[in-house]
Amino acid sequence: MSKQLKTSFLDSIAQIAPAEWNKLIGSDYPFLQHEFLLSLEESACVSVRSGWKPSHLIIKNHDEKLVALMPLYLKNNSMGEYVFDWSWADAYYQHGIEYYPKYVTSVPFTPSVGPRICIAPLEDEQAVLTKIISCLQQQANSSGASSWHVLFPEKKLSDQLADLGMLQRTGCQYQWFNKNYADFESFLQSFSSRKRKNLKKERKKIQENNIQFEWLNGHEIAPEQWQSFYRFYQNTYLVRGRSAYLNLPFFLELARLMPDQILLVLAKKDDAYIAGALSFKDSNTLYGRYWGCDEEWQFLHFETCYYQGIEYCIKQGLQKFDSGAQGEHKIQRGFEPVFTFSNHWIAHPQFSAAINQFIKEENQHLSRYQKLAEKYLPYKKNENP
């Protein structure tokens, strides 16, 4: 079976038709859509210069039918990945070995779990995955890459890759789940009284400061509103002395290509926009991605990024709010700690063994951490997951 499969690497997502790529994805998960990946490339946010050289993998059968695909990048740094391997790179350097370049299967700058290897429904998944692993190992050896990393795959795929010999690493994020809440107040009723009081206090403070909010879908966002949001987004990085990963042309291109999957929350005070949060959505999930502000107000971040998103999910019937990487402060606001996964193939045998041991210890720590973190959820005891 695998001998009949032909692999090809694409220097750009533009080398495959959007309809052909999106059909095989088989879902409306926004970040793997052809339009999203194309916007990253066309805006030059993803390029050799930024450390992300596109090398997307497609597989066709003997009839030239597309049977599998995955995003793939040859990387010369670890920026914008959110699965941190800096210590691995340092260890390589200390031993006089090059860690970069490396291959990464992910969505650039996007720590969101979703499809990573898409396989046609009637294909033998085991055979296709075996072919892909073999292909990437050969490609890494011929190009001098140290490794291949699959970041934020769905658990099923991660387990399949682990069964085929790749290392499996665990991470933790915080997600909100819609338990058929009628409105925000019914969500609050699931809290213990003290936690409910605290959250109401935070929202009341925003109201007392006369801060109001607008929800805008992609086609409703005016150019000047995009300018305001992008200024906020840049501020988030500038306060840390860094430049933003993404540029304004990227966002404008997304608004043109996939407006129905964009939600912009803007905060306004005295007729001026002061903060904003940009999210993406599919039929099931809201994905919180970017935030920033011009003015600092108490609890403004929580309201703009979390409470407005929760309200939107309840009103639109979305089942999950994926709020992105990090942020333990989300726990007491109703976001549950959930495991994320990544898979790794390391070419160097000794380093592979050492990293495997590192991952085992890290996974044990995260398992203990999740159990501890769940104790701090605000829900009444009988509401706890």
What residues fall within each predicted segment?
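N-acyltransferase acceptor-side catalytic subdomain
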Residues: 1-385
